[in-house]
């Protein structure tokens, strides 16, 4: 796959290797240390990390890990999946993956202000990666509203996989929009210049 990307006319396309648990340096040292020992010339450009503070460790752990990766391997880093709750309420009555106890573990209140503070701190962490190797972040499913069929799986997909999944949305309290689709004020963090962080 890597050779195919490199051979295409879009030669500026960056290749990302993605792993979860972004705040857990021991996982990255084990996985990428082993991978790059076995394949020292592996052709890729960016370390992609998932980072959800309620599951993946502290912001300090994330900073240490991305600094380590950028400094040790000379590659860029990007948080390719992240989100944080703006409420512990449930917009569709099916339950959510982020619940009230996750606030304490995640380090931020599940409020619009807490969501803003999380993203602001995350941007600061990325900006502090040595040698400008921090690319940015992708906010996972900012518009996943509690609406009919607002789920990651279609009926056809569930049938194809022979799954028992009941279509639902367990992410509606981690969007950047309220349950009615109005933008939250926390979305403004995306417009602030880096020098204001």
Regions found by a protein language model. Give the residues of each.
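Aromatic-lined carbohydrate-recognition surfaces of secreted/lumenal glycan-active proteins
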Residues: 1-29, 76-84, 135-142
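Acidic (Asp/Glu)-rich catalytic clusters
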Residues: 6-10, 34-43, 66-72, 131
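A residue-level marker of the well-folded mature domains of exported/periplasmic proteins
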Residues: 7-16, 41, 89, 165
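Feature marks short, surface-exposed loop/turn motifs that line or immediately flank catalytic pockets
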Residues: 23, 53-55, 86, 143-146
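Distinct, well-ordered alpha-helical segments
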Residues: 23-40, 58-66
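Substrate-binding/catalytic cleft of secreted carbohydrate-active enzymes
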Residues: 51-65, 91-93
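Aromatic-rich peripheral "rim/lid" segments of glycoside hydrolase catalytic domains that contact
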Residues: 68-71, 87-133, 138-197
């Amino acid at each position: 796959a890597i050779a195919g990307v490199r051979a295409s006319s879009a030669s500026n396309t960056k290749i990302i290797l993605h792993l979860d648990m972004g705040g857990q340096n021991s996982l990255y040292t084990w996985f990428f240390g082993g991978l790059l020992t076995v394949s020292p010339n592996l052709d890729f450009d960016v370390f992609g990390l998932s980072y959800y503070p309620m599951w993946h460790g502290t912001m300090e752990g994330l900073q240490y890990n991305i600094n380590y990766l950028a400094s040790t391997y000379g590659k860029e880093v990007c948080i390719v999946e992240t989100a944080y709750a703006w409420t512990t309420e449930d917009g569709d009555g099916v339950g959510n993956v982020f619940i009230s106890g996750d606030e304490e573990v995640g380090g931020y209140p599940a409020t619009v202000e807490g969501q803003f503070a999380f993203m602001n701190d995350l941007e600061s962490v990325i900006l502090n990666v040595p040698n400008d190797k921090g690319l940015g972040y992708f906010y996972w499913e900012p518009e996943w509203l509690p609406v009919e069929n607002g789920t990651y799986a279609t009926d056809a997909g569930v049938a194809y996989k022979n799954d028992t999944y009941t279509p639902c949305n367990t992410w509606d309290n981690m969007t950047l929009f309220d349950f009615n689709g109005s933008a939250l004020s926390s979305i403004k963090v995306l417009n602030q210049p880096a020098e204001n962080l």
